[in-house]
Amino acid sequence: MKTLEMELGQNSYSIFIEKGIMNDIGKRISKLYSGEKIVLITDDNVNKFYGEKLEKNIKDFGYDVFKIVIKAGEKSKNIKTLTDIYSRLAEFRITRSDLIVTLGGGVVGDIGGFAAATYLRGISYIQIPTSLLAQIDSSIGGKVAVDLEQGKNLVGNFYQPKAVFIDPLFLKTLDIRFLHDGMGEVIKYGAIRDGELFKRLEEFKDDNELMDNIEYVIHACCRIKKQVVENDEKDNGERMILNFGHTIGHAVEEFFHYEKFTHGECVAYGMYSITKNSERLGITKEGTTEKLKNIIKKYSLPFNIDNLKNERIYEIAALDKKSRGKFINLVLLKDIGDCFIEKVESKETYKYLRVV
C-alpha cells in the first residue's frame, strides 16, 4: 500500500492507494468515523458493479447505510440533482455528526462533496474514486462543485475530505474510452511538473503495460497534486497550474453541451491547442507541441476537433475561474515538465485560445 499525507493543518488527511482496498472499506472507515449513519452517494453505472458490495461491507461494521443513486454523466452535475440530494439527506435525518461517502467518478465526487460542504453548513465526507480521472485528480484537493448552463464548475467550494481511498482494481470494469479519458489528466501532470512521468508514458508499449504500472502512475500524479495543493489550497497562485489545458478544454465541453467529448478528451485537446499557439508565439520550446501530439494520439485522445467556433470558445473562456477582472491567468509550457502562469489581458487571449 502507498500512502500520501495531505498536510493542510486542521484539514489534513490521508490518501490510501492499494489494490483490493475496497474489500476492506468498512474496517477502514471505522478507524476514522465512530458515528452511526453513513450516506453512500454513487451513480447508476457504478452502483451496478460495486454499490451492493460496498454497502454490505460498511453495514457489517454496524453502520446504518442510506444510499443515493444519481444518473451517471456530467449532465447530472447540476443544481436540480444537488437539491434532490439535499432532500434525501433531510429524509434520512442526517446531522452534522454523520458521514457521506462518495463512490464514483468525478461527477459523483464533485456533487457529493459539494452536498457535504453545504448541507447543514458542512458534513464530513470520504472519497472513493472509481475512475482513473477521479483517482489521480478530482478526488484530491477538496474542490467540489456543480455546473450551470453557462459553464462548468461555476458554483463550488473548497472542502477537504476526511480521507481518499484509491483502489486501482476499480479500473478493471472501466470502459477503455474512460481509461483514456483519465490519461488526459495523467499527461497533464507529466507536462506541467514531471518529465520522467511523461517519458514513462511515452515508453509504455500498450494499455496492458500501462495497467501493469498503474499504481506508479496514480501515485506519481497524486504526489504532484498533493505538493501543489499544500502550497496553494485555495487556488490563488500555484494551484492554477493544475488547470493546464482546461481553459480551452472546459470551453469545448460547454460548446458541445457535454455530449460529444469527455472531460479528459477536452483537456487533451486544450493542452495541444494552447501549446501549439504558445510555441508559435515563441514562448514554448520548439518541438514541445509535437511531443504532446504524439502522446495524445498514443492514448486515443483528440488533438484535432472539427466545427469549433473561435468566437464561442472566447466567450465561454471569459467565464473561466482563472479570470481576474480584465485579465485571465493562462497556464503555458516552457518545455515538457516546466510550466508557468501568464497573466493575459482579455483582449489578447485570442492569441492563446485560438482553436487549431
UniProtKB/Swiss-Prot annotation:
Its cofactor is NAD(+); Co(2+); Zn(2+). Its EC number is 4.2.3.4. The keyword Translocase does not apply. It is found in: Cytoplasm. It holds the Pfam family DHQS_C. Pathway: Metabolic intermediate biosynthesis; chorismate biosynthesis; chorismate from D-erythrose 4-phosphate and phosphoenolpyruvate: step 2/7. One of its GO terms (cellular component) is cytoplasm. It catalyses: 7-phospho-2-dehydro-3-deoxy-D-arabino-heptonate = 3-dehydroquinate + phosphate. PANTHER family: 3-DEHYDROQUINATE SYNTHASE, 3-DEHYDROQUINATE SYNTHASE, CHLOROPLASTIC. Catalyzes the conversion of 3-deoxy-D-arabino-heptulosonate 7-phosphate (DAHP) to dehydroquinate (DHQ). NCBIfam families: aroB. This is 3-dehydroquinate synthase. It comes from Clostridium acetobutylicum (strain ATCC 824 / DSM 792 / JCM 1419 / IAM 19013 / LMG 5710 / NBRC 13948 / NRRL B-527 / VKM B-1787 / 2291 / W). The gene is aroB.
